[in-house]
Amino acid sequence: VSGYTDVLVETSGPVLTLTINRPEAGNKLRAQTLLELKDALQRFRTDPGLRAAVLTGAGDRFFCIGGEHDETTSLDYSQVLPIIDVYEAIDTIAKPVVAAVNGFAVGGGNVLHTVCDLTVAAENAVFRQVGPMVGSFDAGYGTWYLEDTVGRKRAKEMWYLNRKYTAAQALEMGLVNEVVPAGEAVQRAQEVAAEIATRSPLAIGGLKAAFSARHNGVLGQARMAHDQQLTLYLATREAHELGEAFAARRRPDPEKFWS
């Protein structure tokens, strides 16, 4: 699409492929990236010739390692990163989105693939939630959708302990659908999307709506928590100390959380 700087768009028959194109930055999600993804997903929604999509990150090291930290600290509501808009778009479009995880899926990147309908992971993929380590947290999709996907205990383990999980472990816990050799995730995801595109679009759309229906009431809570509560949290001393410690590769000082 003309004018995009952070997202590459490719179509092959009924399949759309969206690639987050910031490999030098770990394919982090800044405001520009999210606005382009939101626009591309809206075009996908309204194009009758496109029946399935693939979402991936450029390069072979990173799928996405979350939000651009420098753009997440404003208390101005108008400046909140529109990441919930992207999650919501993927969740509510009556067409399937298949994630191709080709490397690290960390923080918001792990949430991003979780919100997708299916996930194909390369064998070198790594999955991790890091919020409590770096002074942040997920306020909606990354908690209850993750719980739906891997179970309550495992989801809390991922969030509370911030461990790294291999592609094999992710497959075992149900976080991904399939693991393929390194470098083959995108191609395999496109094959899966093309196969889905041969099915009834109305039936697939109805199924997706049914899967998402029981979460509709939670969406407003997710928005409130992300856009308001998380924004306020990022201004606390605790969030600042955790973020600074992570950047400096040192242990955080808990005394600075409230002093």
PLM segments and residue spans:
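Crotonase-fold acyl-CoA enzyme core
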Residues: 89-201
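Conserved CoA-thioester-binding segment of acyl-CoA-metabolizing enzymes
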Residues: 1-56
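Terminal peptide-recognition signature
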Residues: 18, 22, 36-37, 55, ...
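Glycine-centered loop/turn positions within well-structured domains
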Residues: 24, 60-61, 144, 156
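A general structural signal for well-ordered alpha-helical segments in protein cores
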Residues: 69, 83, 143, 152-155, ...
